């Protein structure tokens, strides 16, 4: 059974929810007993940034995942991290994943317009550009139907409720199924 790691922030971690209510666990539950079933490695860390994810990538790759879902960048954007640094870190993560023989999937993130048109536009362009340049799977906006929907988020307006996580799982599932199906790794060494 393939191993799927989620390298993410508080959204992957399921902040303020039970572990089995976070979208990575929901995806594992949905696919259990199916051809796309997988073992979950949830490496979501609340508050994590692309720089933190890049530092943690080697540790995650030591666990030999077949697929790595990268859900990072929101905390960078909310802190106004320079766009070139965000892109460099995401590129580094995706290249490490691919070089380790795993299939990367990058989840696109968006920012509120209050961060300024130039920054927001530049930020949102990073994900599809990297997906295209590196040839990796990409979910354009994995928070579609959740971001900005009060009934899908906790009182902070940033972190999804259990219902919101169900929608995230539905948004990510097609790309994850495709990534699992494409796993063509060489036999792992003992």
Model-derived regions, located:
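Serine-esterase "nucleophile elbow" of acetyl-processing enzymes
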Residues: 1-46, 56-64
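Alpha-helical cap/lid subdomain in secreted, periplasmic
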Residues: 36, 52-190
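N-terminal helical cap/lid subdomain that shapes the substrate entry/recognition surface
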Residues: 47-51
């Amino acid at each position: 059974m393939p191993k799927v790691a989620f390298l993410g922030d508080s959204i992957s971690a399921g902040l303020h929810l039970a572990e089995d209510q976070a979208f990575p666990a929901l995806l594992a539950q949905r696919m259990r007993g199916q051809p796309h079933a997988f073992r979950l490695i949830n490496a979501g860390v609340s508050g994590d940034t692309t720089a933190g994810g890049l530092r943690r990538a080697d540790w995650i790759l030591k666990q030999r995942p077949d697929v790595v879902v990268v859900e990072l960048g929101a905390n960078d954007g909310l802190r106004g991290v320079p766009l070139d640094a965000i892109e460099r870190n995401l590129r580094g993560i995706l290249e490490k994943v691919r070089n380790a023989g795993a299939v990367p999937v990058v989840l696109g993130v968006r920012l509120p317009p209050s961060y300024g048109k130039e920054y927001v536009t530049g930020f949102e362009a990073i994900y599809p550009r990297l997906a295209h340049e590196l040839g990796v799977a990409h979910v354009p906006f994995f928070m579609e139907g959740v971001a900005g929907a009060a009934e899908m988020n906790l009182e902070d307006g940033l972190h999804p409720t259990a219902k919101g996580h169900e929608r995230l799982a539905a948004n990510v599932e097609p790309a994850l199924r495709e990534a699992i199906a494409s796993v063509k790794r060489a036999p792992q060494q003992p």
